Amino acid sequence: MLDFGELLPLQPPTIPAHQLPPAALAYFGDAVYELFIRLLFLTPPQRINAYHRQVVAHVRAESQARYMDFLWEYCTETERSIFRQGRNAAADGPKRVAAKIYRQATGFEALLGYLYLTNPQRLQEIFQLLAGHIRSEVENKTHAAESPSEM
């Protein structure tokens, strides 16, 4: 099992997270999340194009919103509040994504940015939950693709 705390060794800035606007937390959380996903799919070794396809599939707003739905039951009230602040601060997203989905993804990113800055151990726990969930999704999708279709 990957220890994401060791893989994300950067020291957070000394700016208290509560002084950052939710959009800034989301901006930062987006980078933290993409690094997590890239690390998650780094093994087994594969071609760069395959890495890219996997990462893009999981950093899309639709995936982030789905993962936030999964995490909701594990979130504390403070974490839910940070999510709501990020969701409510979301600007208009790309036209290809429904506004509700984009706002949920922004809230998800704000939560990850907040946790990175305030509680790296909790972020590690969230990433472990997500890693298990994502691997399960990928495995189920792989098995479904390998199963012969019934006609």
UniProtKB/Swiss-Prot annotation:
Which BP terms in the Gene Ontology apply to this protein?
rRNA processing
Q: Which GO terms describe its molecular function?
A: ribonuclease III activity; rRNA binding
Against SMART domains, the record matches this protein to: RIBOc
The record's section on InterPro entries has: Mini3_fam, RNase_III_dom, RNase_III_sf
Q: Which domain of life is it from?
A: Bacteria
- Please report a single Pfam family linked to this protein: Ribonuclease_3
Instruction: Name any cofactors this protein relies on.
Output: Mg(2+)
Q: What is its EC number?
A: 3.1.26.-
Q: What does the UniProt keyword field contain? A: Cytoplasm, Endonuclease, Hydrolase, Magnesium, Nuclease, Ribosome biogenesis, RNA-binding, rRNA processing, rRNA-binding
Q: PANTHER family given for it?
A: MINI-RIBONUCLEASE 3
How is the subunit organization of this protein annotated in UniProt?
Homodimer.
Q: What is this protein called?
A: Mini-ribonuclease 3
What is the organism field in this record? Thermosynechococcus vestitus (strain NIES-2133 / IAM M-273 / BP-1)
State which gene encodes it: mrnC
